[in-house]
Amino acid sequence: MSTKKKEAVIGKESLAHKGLLRTITLVSTFGGLLFGYDTGVINGALPFMATAGQLNLTPVTEGLVASSLLLGAAFGAMFGGRLSDRHGRRKTILYLALLFIAATLGCTFSPNASVMIAFRFLLGLAVGCASVTVPTFLAEISPAERRGRIVTQNELMIVIGQLLAYTFNAIIGSTMGESANVWRYMLVIATLPAVVLWFGMLIVPESPRWLAAKGRMGDALRVLRQIREDSQAQQEIKEIKHAIEGTAKKAGFHDFQEPWIRRILFIGIGIAIVQQITGVNSIMYYGTEILREAGFQTEAALIGNIANGVISVIAVIFGIWLLGKVRRRPMLIIGQIGTMTALLLIGILSIVLEGTPALPYVVLSLTILFLAFQQTAISTVTWLMLSEIFPMHVRGLGMGISTFCLWTANFLIGFTFPILLNHIGMSATFFIFVAMNILAILFVKKYVPETKGRSLEQLEHSFRQYGRRADQEIQNQTTHLS
């Protein structure tokens, strides 16, 4: 075969590899789309379902309806990591698609607040499990040089899901607002992407790293050859084999007795909580309520809330581009400074401009500024780093524990926000978030490492080396004291 023909064949194979990788990414990130829609739709549905004759919600039950999904997501994240480690990333996502469909229908036809809270909890199990499994799956199929952009496409689909929720809320609320069951129409739309996810995952291959961890090296290499050039696949399977030597045992909590793994878990939990204590989901879940509190009417607040969704999508696209240019750690710190500034201004100007016609527009502008920093830097980096830092044999469990903490923090914020807003007002509530942002910046500066440009196996080796150095220092100190 001539050189030109060989190059043509290689070029076609390369296009086929990239095409399949894009298909896998698109299909699996429908889990992220559902995550976004199901967390965002409550933003516009709450004012309608809270009314007399519907679910008759009080501030407490309103908080429970919004946050029961988050509590479910915490447990879904915890068990989802173990489930995906045991049954595989692909099969777990297939199960999740069915749970998304069943729980969404349960929420849609809920006759009272208690049933709604129960089905929102079940929906949360699916959301939490997806929040662990999908980024892990994407990280494990991605080449190191493209991992950042591929994994953060899940974050893009999350905010697209939220934008779709806000848009459908505004359209349905404006055109069918007189209907008693308008909120049910908002909720049931989520069954459509769940059906797409289920059918799509039937044609997607399993994670090669999960297959290798189960001793199925031949299957792992076969999958890698579908999404990599042959030489790259061969090199990658060697790295994977080397990484799992001596770690073929079943993952369990006993693994966290090792100091280097315990340190990674500490960092993972910290990163997860940092993402939440910015207060982002108080805006994503209660944006309509915040704008009503500032002075907008319900219909205007629903429409204004679309701006939050649009800026989130634009910001994540920009963040994905930035990840190819900028290191993770500086992005995270700059994002935190930006969100803290926006929250501080909301708190101050809500006092200065209280009762004026300008206040709702100022609050809307500042929430857009807040989301620009949050979605460009913090949210994109959070999910990416959580999928990167854990070693292969505890990746599902470690990410599950970290994401459990993320959703627990999310639940606490989601539940307490409407209560705080009702009792201490908007300004004081946002000042609390400013204080928590300061603590978050200090944590990132002290503990969070840089992960850009390194394979998952190289990161694991680096953490192991750190652990050995720490052990040696402790041993030297013990020897010196004795």
From Swiss-Prot:
GO cellular component, one term: plasma membrane
Subcellular location per the Swiss-Prot or TrEMBL entry: Cell membrane
Chain ranges on the Extracellular side, renumbered to this chain: 51-59, 114-120, 177-184, 285-301, 422-423
Keywords for this protein: Cell membrane, Membrane, Transmembrane, Transmembrane helix, Transport
Residues on Cytoplasmic side: 1-29, 81-92, 142-155, 206-263, 323-331, 374-400, 445-482
Gene3D superfamilies noted in UniProt: MFS general substrate transporter like domains
Family annotation (InterPro entries): MFS_dom, MFS_sugar_transport-like, MFS_Sugar_Transporter, MFS_trans_sf, Sugar/inositol_transpt, Sugar_transporter_CS, XylE-like
Membrane topology summary: Multi-pass membrane protein
A GO term, aspect molecular function: D-glucose transmembrane transporter activity
Ranges that cross the membrane: 30-50, 60-80, 93-113, 121-141, 156-176, 185-205, 264-284, 302-322, 332-352, 353-373, 401-421, 424-444
UniProt cross-references to Pfam families, sorted A to Z: Sugar_tr
Biological process (GO), any one: D-glucose transmembrane transport
Presence of the UniProt keyword Lipoprotein in the record: no
Family to which the UniProt record says this protein belongs: Belongs to the major facilitator superfamily. Sugar transporter (TC 2.A.1.1) family.
Protein name: Putative metabolite transport protein YfiG
Gene: yfiG
